[in-house]
């Protein structure tokens, strides 16, 4: 008999935290679950401790795989292995709140069959556990009880602009929905949530916010997500994310029934973020030209078609900026002029009183070595 929940846990070098993470599941009063732990090649006793706990509870299932530097492999393999009706993603240094599985089960039972059940997370910094912050994308006073994926996409843009939290851990997924759409994370990508979540949200037929603070998210300096903030990984990851999301828009925008407001929404989010990351004056000064060109060549390795298509839904200023982006990438002689244009572009935007683009939720998305300069 298949369990109600499949909890997929990414585990790599988390010896100090792994027992607490697993016990936050095993001590739940609701017991109809399986916990699938993906063990990346670790330098500490993570695997040893997990094998000890799995021997004591047959609901804990283990698999190992080579070190990849991200949670993508565990999440993909774990989804393939999962037998439960609903999937929860948990990191090996985080926990879930007491009695939360029972509460979520009852809420799902009251509104069964949705593809996504967004919840809340409780974020805290290691060493300052008494200072906690609840984060939610769908405030009860601003969100209907149920939405389509398109409605949810547009609502997040209206409520948060680009500042909604894309973390997979915030959402309970119907497993058959993930399988039906072959929703997978890009292998090795450290910011896979930012690429995966917009696609999953758009494809969902039913989204039911639960307003349940069930996930305890630990912010620590040596985590994978913190390592992803270094500029070397940072721009490469965002190049891959943008390339994928631009291509996804190009695909779904050709389908019958596509709501053109989604193009407007994604253009406001995606084009603004792209211009800021590669061409905001502070980033131009802080990130070497070679690194920006290297990652732009990754982003546009298949050409500019998908970018141009999304750009059509952007405002006139962003469309003009897109012309200079293409010139910057294609023609070395124009790079200095293009950078001067972007100094003027962002300067005028700020003079008009527009908010400087921000993509932070739990922490800044700008890498530390950029912010410090």
Regions found by a protein language model. Name each.
Residues 2-8, 26-37, 45, 57-61:
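Short loop->beta transition adjacent to catalytic acidic/histidine clusters or analogous donor-positioning motifs
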Residues 65-82:
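Glycine-rich, basic loop-to-helix element that forms the pyrophosphate-binding segment
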Residues 281-373:
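Membrane-interface aromatic/basic loop that binds lipid-linked glycans or pyrophosphate carriers
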Residues 92-209, 215-233:
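Donor-binding/catalytic cores of nucleotide-activated saccharide
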Residues 31, 39-49, 67-68, 96-97:
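A conserved acidic beta->alpha catalytic loop
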Residues 87:
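Short aromatic/hydrophobic "clamp" motif used to bind/position activated sugar donors
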Residues 13-27:
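Short, well-formed alpha-helical segments that are part of the catalytic scaffolds
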Residues 213-221, 227-256, 273-306:
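Catalytic core of nucleotide-sugar-dependent glycosyltransferases
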